Amino acid sequence: MNNQSAKKSPTRLTYISDIIEISPYLRRLVLSGEQLANFPADQQGAYVKVLIPQPGETTVNMTLTGPNAAIKRSYTIREFDPVRGQLSLDFVINKHTGPATDWAKLANVGDTVAIAGPGPLKMNRFDFNDYLLFGDSTSINAVDALIKRLPATAKGHIIMLVNSHQEQALLSQHPLLKTHWLVLNDSITAEQQIDWLLDKLELFGDLPAVTQVFVGLEATQVRVIKQYLLEQQQLPLSSISATGYWKRNTDADTFGKQKQMQPL
């Protein structure tokens, strides 16, 4: 990372000041610390990189690059309270294993962790009349932040896949956007999830040509939704902000390399 990038994305040392169990599958870690004093306000929906220690490390690793770099994972900012200097991040747990989810599951109040960022919002157009927002448990905070930034006159639909009913409370209500929920369980297959998403799209009929879309889902779901919107709805690519938050049966490091070689 060059000096300019480092200035844009400083590394900060924090500690866990509170832990909130949102659901059996979602755990909120509230981070505090003196180095959050100059963290920029109004960053809900942006993201930070959480620097996870390498296996066997017992001290905080604040190294961003090189062979001894920390494991880096992106997490959406749920809330930043500049008065209290508290940053809230939600971690999916008990659905898979990996460095970040394993660390978050075992984390305790008082533990220290480094973060870098913030990075930008995934979507930054809030002057449209019509919106489609797709999300799941990994992107629900990004979707919530977008809802709060939309004008009250915006229309459209919010389509969410979540791991528990408790997570529904995380999403703000918008007067003119209808929310559609699918609460997942082990009996709902990956194929059935995609079928449900496509069924919803077909029920919406022809979308206005200027619809703005956010898609924050599993990688295969992102590809299917994006293809449908481009080919069946003839939406311009510039109107679609699509991000694969994770990929089924693929670890985050491998998925990151795949996205660099073949963007979604």
Swiss-Prot record:
Annotated FAD-binding FR-type domain residues: 9-127
Positions contributing to FAD binding: 73-74, 76, 90, 92, 96, 100-101, 247, 249-250, 252
Keywords: FAD, Flavoprotein, Nucleotide-binding, Oxidoreductase
Gene Ontology terms, MF aspect: metal ion binding; nucleotide binding; oxidoreductase activity
Keyword Acyltransferase: no
Protein family according to the UniProt entry: Belongs to the SIP oxidoreductase family.
Protein function: Ferric-siderophore reductase involved in iron removal from the siderophores after their transport into the cell. Catalyzes the reduction of the ferric iron bound to the hydroxamate siderophores produced by Shewanella to ferrous iron. Can use a ferredoxin as electron donor. Despite the clear evidence for the interaction with NAD(P)H, no direct reduction of the enzyme by these compounds is observed, nor consumption of NAD(P)H, suggesting that NADH and NADPH are not the physiological electron donors.
Name of this protein: Ferric siderophore reductase
